[in-house]
Amino acid sequence: MSRVVLAYSGGLDTSVCIELLRERYGYDEVITVTADVGQPEEELREAEEKARKLADEHFTVDCVDEFVCEYCWRAVKANATYEGYPLSTALARPLIAQKVLEVARDVDADAVAHGCTGKGNDQFRFESYLRAHGGEEFEIVAPVRDLNLTRDEEIAYAEERGIPVPVDVDSPYSVDENLWGRSIEGGVLEDPSEEPPEEVFEWTVSPAEAPDEPEVVEIEFEDGVPVEVDGRDDPVEIVRYLNETAGEHGVGRIDIIEDRVIGLKSREVYEAPAAVTLLEAHRALEAFTLTRRELSLKASLEEEWARLVYDGLWFNPLREHLEAFFDSTQRHVEGTVRVKLFKGSATVISRESPRALYEEELISYEEKQFDQRTAEGAVKLHGLQERLALRRRG
């Protein structure tokens, strides 16, 4: 008996994949796996109910704590964004792929499958991990891509077979959610000249409709990661709280043109209130506690880390080398940052740290502890190479 394990979200793509794997690929059993990485409880419940009707067996794997502590907190240390996007979907994919492989081994499956299209990034993220960690054990199947299905064709296929799906031709948005962020694609969003309609947003209010009074949150960091926010010290609760609180003030909306792995440019809309707030606070604390050269080198390495994750290369050895450097710097990133949330902005208004490299007595114009006359020699030498180049090169 042939058996395939499908990474299952409950959305259109993965729902039609269940029947396609039987009908077009001939698998006798289709087993679905949903990884809980912080999706809304209602979404998880609906996915599980649907999977139990459509699939032969279903597993929901709780990995939200692991997602925050082992993935999101690494992203905070790396100040990770790709072209302005905090990598929410990209961060979750290797963890989901790992859980799919674990179930596939437990049930003695012949193959693993995903519902990614041939135009998106997730096919790279899932398959690179699956091939690296299970390519010799399992066949990898991608029905939507391999059958070259359009979204309208998937909707029609679902309607013909009575497969319940959360979209139709009048509301064709594709949404992916985890605790670190929410991504929205499709429909009118594919026209970059059109403003995203308010109906696509769920986590954030319109900045114009946000409260007229700002709210300040206090974030405490140790070793570069948040350990307490307004009295909350559980990692998952910290992210949930900031998603709710910052979202109420319109913080975290992102609308960008993004360069996909495959080479296409796409219009992407995201909501990431907690990620945006935490990254803003973390950068401010780093500027307070790290040297200029540490910050400069780290900025270039952060870009490389983010690109690895975005491209689906979580398992690349370079990521671990980069994180070794990040971890070394983060030993000094300790302190408290206060962030004001107001009508779409998250603004750092204060920072305190026992490891601060800021010395008020030295920088103050009212103090004489720093002898200004000692700067004369440095000023004379500053730009020496540039002056020589100007003379000798004309």
Swiss-Prot record:
Gene3D superfamilies reported in the protein's UniProt record: Argininosuccinate synthetase, chain A, domain 2, HUPs
Give the GO cellular component terms, alphabetically.
cytoplasm
Per UniProt, the enzyme's principal EC class comes to: ligase
What SUPFAM superfamilies does the annotation carry? Adenine nucleotide alpha hydrolases-like, Argininosuccinate synthetase, C-terminal domain
Q: Which residues bind L-aspartate?
A: 117, 121-122
Q: Mention any Pfam family matching this sequence.
A: Arginosuc_synth
Residues bound to L-citrulline are: 85, 121, 125, 174, 183, 258, 270
Could you tell me one molecular function GO term of this UniProt entry?
ATP binding
Q: State where ATP binds.
A: 7-15, 35, 115
Q: Where in the cell is it found?
A: Cytoplasm
- Predominant cellular place of this UniProt entry's protein: cytoplasm
Write out the pathway annotation from the protein's UniProt entry: Amino-acid biosynthesis; L-arginine biosynthesis; L-arginine from L-ornithine and carbamoyl phosphate: step 2/3
Q: Give the EC number(s) listed in the UniProt record.
A: 6.3.4.5
Assigned keywords, A-Z? Amino-acid biosynthesis, Arginine biosynthesis, ATP-binding, Cytoplasm, Ligase, Nucleotide-binding
Signal sequence: where? none
Catalytic reaction list: L-citrulline + L-aspartate + ATP = 2-(N(omega)-L-arginino)succinate + AMP + diphosphate + H(+)
**BP terms from Gene Ontology:** argininosuccinate metabolic process; L-arginine biosynthetic process; urea cycle
Q: Which family does it belong to?
A: Belongs to the argininosuccinate synthase family. Type 1 subfamily.
Subunit organization: Homotetramer.
Q: What is this protein called?
A: Argininosuccinate synthase
